[in-house]
């Protein structure tokens, strides 16, 4: 990341968060976000681990290698460590289809570009003893920066409407997902121990 881009990226995130308070006519609302928007992933997001292409398998292995150090949430959330310093959105995300856990955002990575080895968010499942277990990564692009869905590894991002207003794609690099490697929700992840 170029140091002179930091203020611009922060400004973009601030604008995206402000826009999150405004209705977006062609984007699902927060109440339909869990069902409609995530359904937009289509068949591509339901690819199970055994059905991944050779390129996708290698990419997941590369993501695991790049994010291995984030198993230590203290390092991941330190400003001088991983830089994933804020929750976005706040709280443990769950739905009838499974959960995603807590999302930690690296604000400096949010822009119109998607970099496989530099995900904008890392996701953690809360454990019974207060520990946080790394389960996957999430890539986002503010809707305001891309009129069409970005793609990664041949999989289109899904639009998430207010209050988030982003395109999103999950990779369950650290927790097997029977719904698929790129599915939005993972039934093997739980918010049961969220505090």
Language model features: what each stretch is:
Residues 18-20:
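C-terminal motif of bacterial Sec signal peptides marking the signal peptidase cleavage site
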Residues 37-195:
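Primary mode marks residue(s) on the alpha4-beta5-alpha5 output face of response regulator receiver
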Residues 1-8:
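N-terminal secretory signal peptides that target proteins for export/translocation
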Residues 29-33:
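N-terminal secretory leader/proregion of peptide precursors and effectors
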Residues 22-25:
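Bacterial signal peptide processing site
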């Amino acid at each position: 990341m170029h140091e002179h881009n930091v203020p611009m990226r922060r400004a973009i995130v601030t604008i995206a968060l402000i826009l999150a308070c405004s209705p977006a006519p062609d984007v699902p609302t927060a109440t339909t976000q869990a069902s409609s928007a995530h359904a937009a992933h289509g068949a591509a997001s339901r690819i199970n681990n055994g059905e991944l292409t050779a390129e996708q398998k290698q990419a997941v292995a590369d993501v695991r290698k790049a994010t291995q150090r984030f198993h230590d949430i203290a390092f991941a959330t330190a400003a001088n460590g991983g830089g994933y310093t804020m929750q976005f959105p706040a709280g443990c995300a769950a739905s009838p289809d499974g959960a995603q856990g807590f999302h930690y955002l690296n604000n400096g990575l949010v822009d119109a570009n998607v970099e496989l080895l530099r995900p904008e968010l890392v996701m953690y499942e809360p454990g019974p003893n207060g520990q946080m277990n790394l389960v996957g990564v999430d890539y986002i692009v503010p809707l305001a920066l891309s009129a069409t869905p970005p793609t990664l590894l041949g999989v289109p991002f899904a639009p998430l409407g207010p209050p988030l207003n982003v395109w999103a794609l999950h990779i369950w690099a650290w927790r097997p997902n029977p719904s698929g490697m790129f599915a939005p929700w993972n039934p093997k992840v739980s918010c049961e121990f969220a505090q």
